[in-house]
Regions:
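A cross-taxon signal for low-complexity, glycine/charged-rich
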Residues: 1-6, 13-16
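Low-complexity, Ser/Thr/Pro/Gly-enriched N-terminal "stalk/linker" regions
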Residues: 16-64, 328
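Loop-centered beta-sheet repeat module
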Residues: 158-234
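Solvent-exposed loop and edge beta-strand segments that line ligand/cofactor-binding
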Residues: 17-21, 56-73, 113-129, 168-181, ...
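Extended ligand-binding groove/face enriched in aromatic
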Residues: 73, 82-191
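Well-ordered alpha-helical scaffold segments within catalytic/enzyme domains
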Residues: 17-19, 76-89, 130-145, 184-195, ...
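Fungal-biased detection of long, low-complexity, Ser/Thr-
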Residues: 267, 271-344
């Protein structure tokens, strides 16, 4: 990114935290800069023989950019979302042309082929699965383009994997990284409600099974490389899956002392010591995802708690929104979480 653009991001700590056309343009520029950038790249691959040693582009005809597969998927989600929310965006034409080229049947078939490889059952489970469903759900909101129809076979494949996986996942994965069960179910439910009612019912049931009896969460977080809040992501999952009335009763027992700003760990933005370290840089994502959670369940809370939730979200946004660009270890993915938070 240029120095001028970085200076613009640095000023965001002092501004209102809304998704503006100016911010949308900056985020679109970031995503366009990495979704087709093949290297550096971190593959999620189990080798079954030397013939499997292929380049990211050969393995993944669409999602070979953005450092890793899942970041490329949600980079596309980000671009399509910005194209829909801001149709006058200068970058909209570039997004459309690139999507027409990349989100095409032959390339989707190549992505599906990868899922048939030996040992691919755990590929991107569940984070990448959920983001692919989110991308398809967003593509469905663009009826002037064939993107949703073309992506549907891939979405159905990952929905099927969720149907197999969730019944045998005896315990939820609570760590605040890519393996987090609650986050995946939040994204998957949004796709499943209009597309797969049986999967939607399964997600609601499993959320109740996993989290329904949780009380007095201690919120021992953050871990040193987490980008999700285990506590707040679980809470948002319960709101999305159980509805506001049930959520309020559950939430009162899960975090009963919020009015006293306890647990204190949930109110303090994480400190990021080294943004060039890809794992430590996850903590900027933690601040942004916490802001998304606080803002997202604030409407279900009593007015005093809702105000506290929004204030806490603003503090977390101020801490990390200025750092969405600047180092590729964060730049290849953070804008997505900024948009989640700003749009909430």
């Amino acid at each position: 990114m240029t120095a001028a653009v970085l200076d613009c991001f640095a000023s965001l700590a002092m501004t209102a935290h809304d998704l503006t056309p100016d911010l949308a343009a900056r985020f679109a520029g970031i995503a366009l800069g990495h979704v087709t950038r093949e290297y550096p790249h971190k593959l999620d691959q189990v080798l079954d023989g030397p013939e499997d040693l292929l380049s990211p582009r050969e393995l993944h005809p669409i999602f070979f950019g953005s450092f890793d597969w899942h970041s490329c998927v949600h980079g596309w989600w980000l671009m399509l979302r910005l194209r829909r929310l801001f149709p006058e965006l200068a970058a909209a034409a570039r997004i459309e042309a690139l999507a027409d080229e990349m989100l095409a049947p032959a390339k989707v078939a190549g992505e599906l082929d990868y899922l048939d490889r030996a040992y691919s059952g755990g590929f991107e489970r569940p984070y990448g699965w959920a983001w692919l469903l989110a991308l398809h759900a967003e593509a469905q909101r663009h009826p002037d383009r064939p993107w949703a129809e073309d992506l549907e076979p891939l979405a159905r494949a990952f929905a099927g994997r969720f149907q197999t996986y969730l019944p045998k996942l005896t315990y939820p994965i609570r760590v605040g990284t890519h393996f987090n069960t609650a986050f995946a179910m939040i994204l998957a439910l949004e796709w499943a409600e209009p597309n797969d009612p049986l999967l939607a019912d399964l997600i609601r049931d499993r959320a109740r099974d996993y989290y329904g009896q949780d009380r007095r969460c201690q919120a021992w977080e953050p871990g040193g490389d987490e980008f999700l809040s285990s506590a707040l992501t679980e809470a948002l999952c319960m709101r999305r899956t159980q509805g506001d009335e049930a959520f309020r009763g559950w939430f009162a027992g899960f975090l009963p002392d919020l009015a006293s700003r306890a647990p204190p760990s949930l109110f303090a933005p994480a400190t990021v010591a080294d943004r060039s370290d890809g794992k430590i840089a996850h903590l900027d994502g933690l601040n942004l995802s916490r802001a998304w959670c606080w803002r997202s369940f604030a409407p279900a809370l009593e007015p005093e708690l809702a105000d506290l939730a929004r204030k806490t979200a603003d503090e977390h946004l101020a801490a990390s929104l200025p750092h969405v660009a600047g180092d590729y270890m964060g730049e290849h993915w953070l804008a997505t979480f900024a948009v989640l938070a700003l749009e909430a």
